[in-house]
Structure formats: C-alpha cells, structure tokens
C-alpha cells in the first residue's frame, strides 16, 4: 500500500525502519489520493515540496517524513501490537460520535480562529446532553468504564457536514 492512502487516516504509526516514497515526479505523474491536500497540512509545505519534488525514498524516522506518524516503533512486530492496542482502546473507551465530530473539526477546520470557535461551540452544544455525553460524565463520576452507544446520524447534526463537498453527496452513515 502506498503512503498516500494513509494520509487521511486519523492515526498513523510506523516501524522506524519502514521505507516510504512519493515517487510521482520520478514517474511523470501528479500526486494522488488527496496527498496534495493532506501532506502539507501534516508536515508543512517546505517538507512536502521537498518530498514531492525529489520523489526519493525515505525511512520513516527521517526528519523529512517522521511527522507523518504519531508514533514510530523499533520493530514491525511492536508496530502491529501497538496499532492493535490503540484501536482496541479507541473502540472500548471513546464515543464514536464525539470522535467523528472532533476529527472533522480538525480536518475541515474553518479558516479563522473566530469561525472555528463558533463551529466548535455549535458542535459542543449539540453534544451536551446526548446519551454518550451523559454516559461519559456518569461513568467518570462513578469511576467505571463508559459504555458508549451513540451513532453518528446526519439528522442529529443539522450543521454536519459544514464543509463544501464540491459535488460529493452527503455521507450515508
């Protein structure tokens, strides 16, 4: 699998010795899979331009690409083990609705702090008092594990999605 397919993911971990490249300039083609959108946002324009222009191969721990990953691990086995642990933790301990809204707030963030504040406030107020919010607070107060059951439904969030999808239909969740 190419690294460009991982760029939109919420969490990326890698073995520090893994090799990756965006070889498009060496193949005479353009970037793909929204990498022109995600890459500069993840590692900065200067590093993204360097990587895309050279088309070279890098180790995951190279300073040019290491910021693509939230964590680098010393062996492939430890990488898989860690990734599964993180996935299990998310599945067992987080609200899917809250996680989706938080991800979308960061990925589709408005261009100014003021607009972002207004959108975050709207999302926050829509989540306050939901079944997942009530369960999250109650489980915290009772010092027990939360049992989140919420499902992301467009009708529950009339402002979602707030970004212009440019001809793409609303997601069916």
Label every model-predicted segment.
Residues 1-97:
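Crotonase-fold acyl-CoA enzyme core
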Residues 13-18, 60, 69-119, 125-135, ...:
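C-terminal long alpha-helix characteristic of the crotonase
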Residues 143:
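Conserved N-box asparagine in the HATPase_c
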